């Protein structure tokens, strides 16, 4: 499988793993403190062929993803589930994911809207047990996996659902299939 867009990953091990899964070009951020030079490379890549962000499903990976989204408009996102990116010792990273899971993530990329509209209200997430309650975390994980938006806490979930244009009906449908 060939990917035309540049794939942004965190480091060399991620690049090696992704290139074993698909034919592509990558850009490495080399950590969560992305400098202006790296952002400029990503901007140029976005203008020429497009960019897909595929970072580790952890806090530093989310920080990188957020920084890129804030500074480079129109990037696409691919997410690998946390459980699928864990090694036997519990370390999380794209470099630990199965090749098939990397391909799967890259076949289901999503693009946030530049102008996020709020079609979902926080009260809906509370009503559906996604923010408050003993089972909220598990329900968020299920929803995030089904909608392919990456691991999220309650606040991040609301922001992602609105950024990707999901409706209340989409959320209810995904949870019904639980």
Swiss-Prot record:
Binding site for Mg(2+) 1: 10, 56
Record's cofactor remark: Binds two Mg(2+) per subunit.
Annotated residues for binding of Mg(2+) 2: 56, 58
Cellular component terms (Gene Ontology): cytoplasm
Catalytic activity: Endonucleolytic cleavage of RNA, removing 21 and 42 nucleotides, respectively, from the 5'- and 3'-termini of a 5S-rRNA precursor
Function: Required for correct processing of both the 5' and 3' ends of 5S rRNA precursor. Cleaves both sides of a double-stranded region yielding mature 5S rRNA in one step.
Listed name of the protein: Ribonuclease M5
Enzyme Commission (EC) number: 3.1.26.8
The protein's enzyme class: hydrolase
Keywords assigned by UniProt, alphabetized: Cytoplasm, Endonuclease, Hydrolase, Magnesium, Metal-binding, Nuclease, Ribosome biogenesis, RNA-binding, rRNA processing, rRNA-binding
Domain Toprim: 4-100
Gene Ontology molecular function: any one: rRNA binding
Stored HAMAP family: RNase_M5 (MF_01469)
Cofactor(s) needed: Mg(2+)
InterPro entries named in the record: RNase_M5, RNase_M5_C, TOPRIM_dom, TOPRIM_RNase_M5-like
Subcellular location: Cytoplasm
């Amino acid at each position: 499988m060939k990917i035309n867009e540049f794939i942004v990953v965190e480091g060399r091990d991620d690049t090696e793993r992704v290139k074993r899964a698909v034919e592509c070009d990558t850009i490495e951020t080399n950590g969560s403190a992305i400098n202006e030079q790296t952002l400029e490379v990503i901007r140029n890549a976005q203008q020429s062929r497009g960019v897909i962000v595929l970072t580790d499903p952890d806090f530093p990976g989310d920080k990188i993803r957020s920084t890129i989204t804030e500074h480079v408009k129109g990037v696409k996102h691919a997410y690998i589930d946390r459980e699928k990116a864990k090694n036997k010792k519990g370390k999380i990273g794209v470099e630990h994911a199965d090749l098939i899971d990397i391909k799967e993530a890259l076949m289901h990329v999503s693009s946030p809207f530049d102008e996020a509209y709020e079609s979902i209200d926080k009260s809906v997430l509370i009503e559906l047990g996604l923010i408050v309650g003993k089972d909220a975390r598990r329900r968020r994980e299920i929803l995030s996996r089904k909608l392919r938006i990456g691991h999220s806490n309650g606040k991040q979930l609301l922001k992602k659902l609105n950024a990707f244009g999901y409706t209340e009906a989409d959320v209810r449908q995904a949870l019904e299939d639980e």
